[in-house]
């Protein structure tokens, strides 16, 4: 009986964890002032914020990602995090 109860508890915990999805701010360039929250797709476990400087000033993009984007260009700064609304 104890084994059955323990098994049910473990299965419940695993099933509840599978249903979790991240919530990240999402915006592109000039719309980043508002910072609208988006429920990320299944498998997207990172929130990210990319920023870089241009002639018109600093540009920002925020969103969800399955893997943390890499800063491949000099001057591109990337922040990745794994909690809701962290970007």
Swiss-Prot record:
Species this protein is from: Bungarus multicinctus (Many-banded krait)
Official protein name in the record: Long neurotoxin homolog
A Pfam cross-reference name: Toxin_cobra-type
A molecular function (GO) term: acetylcholine receptor inhibitor activity
Location(s) in or outside the cell: Secreted
Any one GO CC term of the record: extracellular region
InterPro entries hit by this protein: Snake_3FTx, Snake_toxin-like_sf, Snake_toxin_con_site, Toxin_cobra-type
Keyword check for Signal: yes
Domain of life assignment: Eukaryota
């Amino acid at each position: 009986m104890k084994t059955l109860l323990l098994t049910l508890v473990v299965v419940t915990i695993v099933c509840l964890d599978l249903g979790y999805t991240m919530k990240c701010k999402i915006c592109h360039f000039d719309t980043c002032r508002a910072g609208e929250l988006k429920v990320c797709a299944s498998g997207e476990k990172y929130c990210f914020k990319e920023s870089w400087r241009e002639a018109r000033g600093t540009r920002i993009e925020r969103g969800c990602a399955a893997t943390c984007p890499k800063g491949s260009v000099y001057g591109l700064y990337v922040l990745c995090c794994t909690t809701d609304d962290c970007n």
